[in-house]
Structure formats: structure tokens, C-alpha cells
């Protein structure tokens, strides 16, 4: 059969006709209008984006009142550190003195911002402490240093920036990057494969090449694959050029002569080109990972290959199926699958729908380009159930002249190109406008090679198409999943559409209220705000920072659903770390456990979630602790002027190291708080000396033990002379 396949990226050759085996899916393909092989360094004076993402607090700065009043530093002793830990309710480790009269203490265990604030508040109540502050993090204030992002004279990165009156089509990413950059999220780009590009490679997970051998009817061999073999573990893009010689072959007879597109590399760069590396471009979710999956070859890809690729990319292939098909297990299942491809063959193929259903059941959203035919109908698989179908708009926010719209379209995203509405007087590419040189393309990673990878070098190119629009949506979906991995696919789609920005007045889509263009224009900031609005509010706490081993411990939590979200929440407690305990009532707000013996640091996570996948967690950190004790001491006795030695022997039921603090130590005597050694080299004067010793395990102090040191005068004669005196008198 023969079908017409349109690229979802638009250019000088915007439509290809291909011969297919089953439904054949072609690139929603490209036009290269600008090439940048290098870029100037970022100039100074960029606009700051505000606070950066800070790690959890790890240190406190403490000022002691005695040091402040004396104006001189006081030695930091073990008892003083122990007291600080006890007062703060957590184990603190002494780090170092500061240049000023202050000291840095480190949390022995990770703490949240709220927990650090609690510790600081407790310490501030101690009369011995003048002040406490959480040691914060300072960052340079920057826009991404990638040179094309920073060049405002030619706004190549308009599609990522906040919308303005003159450039209304931006996806509004800068404010979102203060919240998340996609770390932890995986986006599968099922496309032409990947070219090794410096501005992309660090974020690439190499997946699989799904392109099968050609059918005998099409000449057999690997003409479409163009890599000399069939399916394998190398998703590299070998190039997809078409020559006049290729067109002489039946399989490529309806294809247009063209250079290699490097389509998958451009799409992947829009999702996750490396950010803040001082060169090139930046991706929507530039700390996410792209799972490169190759399913499009020269001119097109086979529908059956693409369906398999969807299953595999989502991690939905069962082990038995993997064994049967020879497919390896996917170690990096994607939460987002991008399909910048399409077919005009009509309805959604059953194999594609089944693959999409399986991917969604595995928790992935499937984002698909609507096509580039300029029609009020969308291509397949954009018309499959459950996908996020993406049309494209221009820098002005008008529907792009090539972009398909119609029933099933979910949202519009930056795709570049020319306006549909002539009355908008959209300036052509490269012309001088009020805001600088007009750039009508989507700028991303590519190659300038015309054929094989070895014929070109990594560059940055502009392309237009719904192929370019779809990865913007995939990138923002990755940001949502990075922020909340538990989201359901329909929930993620609902957030994206509910938060979409209205089309500007006078544009094609603003003039059609039938929903043909979807909910509006992609807005990353509004999407993340919507996520926060629907996330439950939770708290969790323990009875005290330190609990006694063997005691019954009750944890408590609160969970409040947000207006507009589901009002029924499910609760779950999990032990995160520490000696294993048995949690009872772990699906309620008040679980219970018995503190283990021996004890140790314990961490528990409380999560409240709803059926849509909105979830919030709070962690409780506490310590099960047994009190240290001191073995019974034998009271030492000495003669005036003689030495006195004894050593304290302490034990701790948790195996924590025991230190000691002593009071009543006589003048001239020493007590080592680490070893427990008492030494008095010249015990004088005679008398009884009571020394009180308190053991500490660094968290709590045990019972005080006392020992009485007896110092006696030398024995005297009582009416008779001693032997020395008698000898001196010659009487002995």
C-alpha cells in the first residue's frame, strides 16, 4: 500500500510521500534556515532569575555568649558540644571556628529546612548561646550561560523565554528553572536516532535501534535502517539522506531528495540540551535524561517498529516477551515518550493504540505532533486515544501556517514558522523588528553533515514544525514528573492543558472557540504553579528527637487536600533508614513502633496521595537511644603529696562511644573527658574530695556517678618515735 506521510517539521521540503509496510511513520521533518557552529561568550549584566535551588541545610553557625562578652575565643570542649547536641535535640558535630567569634557545627544526619529551623530555635533559647543561624547557600545570579540563550539581539531562544508583547509565544521556562530542571526524569525520544553532540551527549541514555530489515518486496536488506544491520543496542543516527540514486529504488521512489535531517538530535536538544555550560543552547528540562530510541530511518520508519519502540521505551515489555523478541530489558523506563512523527493514513492503528495504552498503564505520557499539512484534522498517531497532541505556534503566538489543528488537539507549543493570520503582519525571518532581529525558528542541537555522521560536525540549527513543538511539551511534562514522580498520565495532561495560556487576541486560534487548537499555549510556570495548587499539605512528627530503646513510639501526621483536588487521600508510612522496626497502623495518621535495641538513627517518610497521583511527603528523623552508664568505682586513697590515678569505665547499650564530664575535680588534678582518666600527681592537702562524673553518648547523658578521693596525712608516732627517729638517736 502507499500512503502520504507528512513531516512534523516544516521546511523547503515539508512533505514526503513514502512507501510503507503496515502504517509507515515519517519524520514530522525539518527546514534548516540558520546554522551556528560557535557562539560568543556570555556578556556581563544578564538579568538575574532569582534564588537558585538550594541543597538541604547541613550546618549551623553558633555564637556563644561568653565569647561575645569576653571578646575572646573559648576552647570548644567535648562537654560543650554534647550540651549543644542535647539542647538542640540532634547530634551536632563540631566543624571549625570562624574568623569572627563564631563556630560552625554540622548536622550528623541529614536535616530538612524545617528541622534545621527547629534545632536553631531550641538553641536560641539556651542562655549560653548568643545567636544561631542556618548556614545558607549563595549562588551566582544568572541566566543560562549558553550563548544563544543570552543573545537578545537575535532572539534564537524565544521559544523558551517568558512571553512578552512582541514575542508572545515563549514557553515561560526561566522562573520554572528555579524550582526544577528535570533531574531524575527520563524522556524517550523515538525518532531518527542520536548524533554525538557535545551540548547533548551528557544527557543521553542510549536505548535501542528498532529499525528492522526491509521486506523482500522492498528489496530486502537494510536500506531504511541505513546502518547495515537490523535491530541492535546502538541508537546512533547514521544519516537519512536521499539521493537521486536512492529514488531509483522502489522503496524510496516517492521520497524527496534531501540531505540528512538529524531530526532526532534536534528534538532531543529541545528536551534536554545541556544547560549552563557556556555554549550553544539549552533544553526545556536540561537536567533530565533523553532515552534515545531509533525507529525512523531513511525517509520513514515502519509502524510496527515504532509500536514496539513505544512498548519498550515505557518499560512495558514483560520478561517473557523480551526473551521471545530478543529485546533487552529497558533499564531506564521513560515517564514521557515523544513522537515527533506522523502519518496521514487516517485512524490510529490498533498496534499503535495498544502500545500507547501499555505505555500509559506503565505510567508514561505520550506526546505526539499533530502534523504539518495546514489542515483542520490531525495526523496519526496524534489522533490515538490518551496522547497529548501538540500543534505549533509562532513567535507571535499565532498558529503556524503549516500546523495541523482539529479535534483531539490538546495544546499548542512553540514550533516556529510563519503566521496563519495575514493581518498580524508577522515580519519575515531575519528582518529587523522593534525587539531586534526576528528569529522565526526553533533553535536546537544538530549536525551540518549532509550524509553520514562523519561528514559533519556538531552545530546548532533552526527548524520549524510540529516536530519542534512536541518536545517543548515533553520537556515541561518531564519537569512535572521530576517534581512529582507519582503523577498519573492523565493528571499530567490535565495540568498542562488547565495551565495553558490564552492565545493572543487577533490570532487564528483566538478566533476559533471550538477547541481546534487545544487548551491554549504551553506555559511552564503556570503548569508548575498548578501542580503546587493541587498538592496536599502534609506534616509529620515524632514525640521527641530522642526516644528510649524499648519504648513505644507514636508518630503523628496531618494531611490536608487542596481545593480543586481530590478530597480523599491515602496514607502510607515507610521506614527510610535505621535499625528495622515493625510499623503498625502504617496506613493511618498515627502509626506506632517499638524503639529497637540496640538503637540508632531512624528515619520515616509519611506520604499522602490521591488517585490522580498528587502526593506530598514529610520525613521524621529521630534516634532510639539507650543511656550510657559507668561501672562502680572503687574509692581511691592516697597520702598527702602522693599520686592518685583512676579510670572511669563506661558502657552504652547502643555501642555509641562514651565520653565523660566531671565536676569537683580538685585543684591540680586533671580529668580527661575522652578517656575517663583522673590524674592527681601531688594530692594535697589532706581531705575528702567528691568527684561527680557524668557519662554521655553524644546524644544524652546517663546517671551521675560519684567517687570520693581520700587524701591522708602521713601516719604519725602517737607517743613513740618512728624507726628513723630512733636510729638518729642511736636507740635502734
Where are the model-predicted features located?
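Primarily auto-inhibitory N-terminal propeptides
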Residues: 38-159, 175-177
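Protease zymogen maturation seam
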Residues: 42-43, 98-100, 124-186, 194-203, ...
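Solvent-exposed loop segments of extracellular immunoglobulin-like
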Residues: 565-572, 654-660
Amino acid at each position: 500500500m502507499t500512503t502520504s506521510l507528512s513531516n512534523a517539521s516544516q521546511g523547503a521540503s515539508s512533505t514526503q510521500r513514502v512507501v510503507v509496510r503496515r502504517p509507515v511513520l515519517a519524520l514530522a521533518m525539518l527546514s534548516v534556515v540558520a546554522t551556528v557552529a560557535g557562539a560568543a561568550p556570555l556578556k556581563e549584566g544578564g538579568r538575574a532569575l532569582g534564588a537558585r535551588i538550594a541543597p538541604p541545610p547541613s550546618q549551623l553557625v553558633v555564637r556563644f555568649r561568653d565569647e561575645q562578652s569576653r571578646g575572646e575565643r573559648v576552647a570548644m570542649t567535648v562537654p560543650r558540644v554534647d550540651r549543644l547536641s542535647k539542647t538542640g535535640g540532634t547530634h551536632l558535630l563540631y566543624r571549625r571556628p570562624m574568623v569572627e567569634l563564631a563556630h560552625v557545627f554540622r548536622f550528623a544526619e541529614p536535616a530538612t529546612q524545617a528541622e534545621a529551623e527547629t534545632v536553631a530555635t531550641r538553641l536560641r533559647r539556651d542562655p549560653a548561646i548568643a545567636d544561631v543561624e542556618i548556614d545558607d547557600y549563595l549562588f551566582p545570579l544568572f541566566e543560562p550561560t549558553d550563548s544563544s540563550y543570552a543573545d537578545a539581539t537575535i532572539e534564537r531562544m524565544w521559544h523558551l523565554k517568558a512571553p512578552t508583547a512582541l514575542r508572545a509565544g515563549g514557553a515561560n521556562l526561566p522562573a520554572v528553572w528555579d524550582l526544577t530542571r528535570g533531574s531524575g526524569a527520563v524522556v524517550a525520544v523515538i525518532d531518527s536516532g542520536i548524533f554525538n553532540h557535545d551540548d547533548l551527549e551528557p544527557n543521553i541514555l542510549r536505548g535501542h535501534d528498532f529499525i528492522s530489515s526491509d521486506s523482500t518486496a522492498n528489496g530486502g536488506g537494510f536500506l531504511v535502517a541505513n546502518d547495515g544491520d537490523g535491530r541492535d543496542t546502538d541508537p546512533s543516527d547514521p544519516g537519512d539522506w536521499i539521493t537521486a540514486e536512492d529514488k531509483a529504488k522502489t522503496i524510496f521512489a516517492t521520497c524527496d531528495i534531501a540531505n540528512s535531517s538529524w531530526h532526532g538530535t534536534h528534538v532531543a536538544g529541545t528536551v534536554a540540551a545541556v544547560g549552563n555550560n557556556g555554549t550553544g543552547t539549552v533544553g526545556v528540562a536540561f537536567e533530565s535524561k533523553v532515552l534515545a530510541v531509533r525507529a525512523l530511518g531513511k525517509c520513514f520508519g515502519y509502524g510496527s517498529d515504532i509500536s514496539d519502540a513505544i512498548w519498550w521505551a515505557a518499560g512495558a515489555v514483560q520478561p517473557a516477551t523480551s526473551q521471545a523478541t530478543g529485546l533487552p530489558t529497558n533499564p531506564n523506563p521513560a515517564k514521557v515518550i515523544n513522537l515527533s512523527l506522523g502519518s496521514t493514513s487516517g485512524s490510529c492503528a490498533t498496534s499503535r493504540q495498544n502500545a500507547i495504552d501499555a505505555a500509559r498503564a506503565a505510567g508514561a505520557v505520550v506526546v505526539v505532533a499533530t502534523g504539518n499539512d495546514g489542515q483542520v484534522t490531525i495526523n496519526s498517531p496524534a489522533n490515538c486515544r490518551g496522547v497529548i497532541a501538540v500543534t505549533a505556534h509562532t513567535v507571535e503566538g499565532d498558529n503556524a501556517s503549516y500546523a495541523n489543528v482539529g479535534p483531539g488537539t490538546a495544546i499548542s507549543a512553540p514550533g516556529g514558522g510563519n503566521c496563519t493570520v495575514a493581518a498580524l503582519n508577522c515580519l519575515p525571518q531575519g528582518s529587523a523588528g522593534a525587539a531586534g532581529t526576528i528569529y522565526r525558528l526553533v533553535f536546537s542541537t544538530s549536525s551540518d553533515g549532509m550524509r553520514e555522521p562523519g561528514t559533519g560536525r556538531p552545530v546548532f540549527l533552526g527548524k520549524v514544525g510540529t516536530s519542534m513543538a512536541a518536545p517543548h511539551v515533553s520537556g515541561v511534562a518531564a519537569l512535572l514528573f521530576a517534581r512529582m514522580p507519582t503523577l498519573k498520565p492523565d493528571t499530567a495532561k490535565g495540568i498542562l492543558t488547565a495551565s495553558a495560556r490564552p492565545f493572543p487576541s487577533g490570532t487564528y486560534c483566538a478566533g476559533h472557540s471550538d477547541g481546534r487548537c487545544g487548551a491554549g499555549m504551553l506555559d511552564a510556570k503556570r503548569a508548575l504553579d498548578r501542580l503546587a495548587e493541587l498538592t496536599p499539605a502534609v506534616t509529620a512528627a515524632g514525640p521527641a528527637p530522642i526516644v528510649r530503646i524499648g519504648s513505644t513510639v507514636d508518630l503523628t501526621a496531618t494531611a490536608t487536600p487542596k481545593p480543586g483536588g481530590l478530597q480523599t487521600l491515602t496514607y502510607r508510612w515507610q521506614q527510610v533508614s535505621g535499625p528495622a522496626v515493625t510499623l503498625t497502623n502504617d496506613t493511618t495518621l498515627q502509626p506506632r513502633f517499638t524503639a529497637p535495641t540496640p538503637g540508632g538513627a531512624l528515619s520515616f517518610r509519611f506520604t499522602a496521595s490521591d488517585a490522580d497521583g498528587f502526593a506530598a511527603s514529610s520525613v521524621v528523623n529521630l534516634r532510639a537511644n539507650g543511656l550510657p552508664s559507668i561501672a562502680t568505682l572503687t574509692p581511691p586513697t592516697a597520702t598527702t603529696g602522693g599520686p592518685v590515678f583512676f579510670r572511669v569505665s563506661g558502657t552504652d547499650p547502643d555501642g555509641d562511644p562514651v565520653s565523660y564530664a566531671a565536676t569537683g575535680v580538685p585543684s591540680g588534678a586533671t580529668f580527661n573527658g575522652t578517656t575517663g582518666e583522673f590524674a592527681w600527681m601531688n594530692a594535697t592537702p589532706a581531705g575528702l574530695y567528691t568527684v561527680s562524673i557524668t557519662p554521655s553518648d553524644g546524644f544524652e547523658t546517663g546517671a551521675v556517678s560519684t567517687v570520693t578521693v581520700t587524701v591522708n596525712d602521713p601516719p604519725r608516732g602517737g607517743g613513740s618515735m618512728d624507726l628513723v627517729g630512733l636510729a638518729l638517736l642511736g636507740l635502734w
